[in-house]
Amino acid sequence: MNDLLMTENPSRLRVTLPRLAALIVGLALVLFPFGWLGEIWRPFGQIVDDLFSTVWAHAIGHTSLFCLLGLLALAMFPVLRRHPWRYLGLLLLAGIGQEAFQLLYKGRLLLFDDMRDLVTDLFGLLLAFATVWGWGWLWRRDR
């Protein structure tokens, strides 16, 4: 990143910074402890409890959130499409960060549920990658 900031080509920097900002906003939404907010602000907590009342609803929520984050990352940084392991590694760190924040505000140790959440996060990331790959394959085939 430092090399990019020191480059003689400012147009490259103008392209990269908005993309990076979009990804940072996406990461902030993923990392934000909505469960904590639900405890502090009870009307919001009631909505969260209603939306994610079952284990399946919770899993679908995690999968959807990380699928959207993956789609955003792949759209903003297309080079990640050629490096699936980097893509998965970097964005799985967001899942680990999310679980770490949840453990901090809940004040407890790691449980089975937290590992299950990471698996659903990984599934969402893989779904995003497969969607982008499939879309690209269809687009190239039709040309």
Question: Which residues does each predicted region cover?
Answer:
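Bulky hydrophobic segments
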Residues: 2-116, 122-143
